[in-house]
C-alpha cells in the first residue's frame, strides 16, 4: 500500500475537494437530519441540535467513509473485490456500498460482533469471516488476506479518503447550523472526530470539537496523553462500535485528532447506558452505545452550559442495537 497524503493536506484542502467528497457521498445516500431539540436546551442549557447519523443508511456514519474510499479507488482498482475489518458498523457500511457498486467484499469481524450488524453484512452480500475474540485479531486476519490476494484494504479509520468521508458530517452540520460553536463527537480510531475537525477548519469554522471516549474503549484518549499511539487490552463495552486499537503505525488519524480536536472527555459504562435509555424513552431515538457517548457527556454534566456559548451539535453516530437489549435498557432508564 502507498503512503497516504500528508495529514496537513486534509485540514487544508480547498473547499472544492471537500465538495467533491460530499457529492460522491450524496450520490448514494441523502443528508441525515440535524434537528434542534428545545427540551434538551431547557434541561441542559444552550441551543442544542442532534445530527442523527443513527438514521443513516446502514445505521451509522460509517457509510460515508466507505463511499468515499470505494469511489476514490475507481472501477478498475476495486473490480476484484475489497477487504475490510470491523467491530460492526464499518463492516455493514462496506458491505452495503460494495453491493451498490457491484464489488465483492470480504469482511473480517471478531466473534463477539453484534448480531444485528452481522446480519446486515450478510444480507448485503458480503463474505463475512468471524475471527478471534478481539478486533485486533480480526484486523490481523484481514491484513493477511490483503497480502494473499492483493485486494485493496478499506481501513475503518486510518485512511485519508475514509476520514474525509466521515468529515462530510461537518459539512452537513454547517448547512443547517452555520454558526455552530461546539460539535460533540465520539472518539475511537479517530476517523469521525479527526475528519469532522479537519472539515470544519477547512471551511473556516473555529467551532470547538469535543471528542468523547468510552471508559472501556479509550485507546486514542490514552495515546494522545502519551503523545504516541499505544496498544491497550480490549475490554468488553456497551459501546462496542468504539472497540479496538488505533494501530501503533497510525499514519493519519492520530495526528488529525491531536492537531484539530479541542477537548476530550471520557464517559463511564453506566452513563452510556443511561443515555441510550433517555434517548429511547424521551427523544424517541434508537441509539447504540457507541452512538450515545456524546449524549452521555451532555447528560452527565461533563459539558455544562457555561462552557458552551452558542449552538451545540451532538453527533449521534449510530443506531445499530439489538432490540431486546435496548428494551432492557429502557426499562431501567
Please place each PLM-identified region on the residue numbering:
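PLP-dependent amino-acid enzyme catalytic core
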Residues: 1-333
Amino acid at each position: 500500500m502507498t503512503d497516504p497524503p500528508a495529514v496537513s493536506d486534509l485540514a487544508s484542502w480547498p473547499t472544492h475537494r471537500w465538495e467533491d467528497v460530499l457529492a460522491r457521498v450524496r450520490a448514494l445516500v441523502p443528508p441525515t437530519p440535524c434537528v434542534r431539540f428545545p427540551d434538551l436546551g431547557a434541561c441542559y442549557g444552550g441551543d442544542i441540535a442532534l445530527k442523527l447519523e443513527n438514521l443513516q443508511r446502514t445505521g451509522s456514519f460509517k457509510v460515508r467513509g466507505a463511499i468515499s474510499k470505494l469511489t476514490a479507488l475507481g472501477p478498475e482498482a476495486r473490480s476484484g473485490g475489497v477487504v475490510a475489518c470491523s467491530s460492526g458498523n464499518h463492516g455493514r457500511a462496506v458491505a452495503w456500498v460494495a453491493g451498490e457498486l457491484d464489488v465483492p467484499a470480504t469482511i473480517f469481524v471478531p466473534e463477539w460482533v453484534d448480531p444485528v450488524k452481522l446480519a446486515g453484512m450478510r444480507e448485503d452480500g458480503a463474505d463475512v469471516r468471524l475471527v478471534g475474540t478481539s478486533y485486533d485479531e480480526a484486523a490481523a486476519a484481514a491484513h493477511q488476506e490483503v497480502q494473499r490476494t492483493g485486494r485493496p484494504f478499506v481501513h475503518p479509520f486510518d485512511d485519508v479518503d475514509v476520514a474525509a468521508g466521515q468529515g462530510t458530517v461537518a459539512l452537513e452540520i454547517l448547512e443547517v447550523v452555520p454558526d455552530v460553536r461546539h460539535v460533540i463527537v465520539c472518539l475511537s480510531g479517530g476517523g469521525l472526530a479527526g475528519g469532522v475537525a479537519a472539515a470544519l477548519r477547512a471551511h473556516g469554522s473555529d467551532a470547538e470539537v469535543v471528542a468523547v471516549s468510552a471508559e472501556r474503549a479509550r485507546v486514542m484518549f490514552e495515546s494522545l496523553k502519551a503523545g504516541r499511539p499505544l496498544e491497550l487490552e480490549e475490554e468488553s463495552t456497551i459501546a462496542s462500535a468504539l472497540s479496538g486499537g488505533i494501530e501503533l503505525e497510525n499514519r493519519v488519524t492520530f495526528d488529525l485528532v491531536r492537531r484539530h480536536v479541542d477537548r476530550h472527555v471520557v464517559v463511564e459504562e453506566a452513563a452510556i447506558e443511561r443515555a441510550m435509555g433517555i434517548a429511547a424513552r424521551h427523544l424517541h431515538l434508537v441509539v447504540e452505545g457507541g452512538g450515545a457517548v456524546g449524549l452521555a457527556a451532555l447528560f452527565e454534566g461533563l459539558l455544562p452550559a457555561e462552557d458552551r456559548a452558542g449552538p451545540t451539535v451532538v453527533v449521534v453516530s449510530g443506531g445499530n442495537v439489538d432490540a431486546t437489549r435496548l428494551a432492557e435498557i429502557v426499562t431501567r432508564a
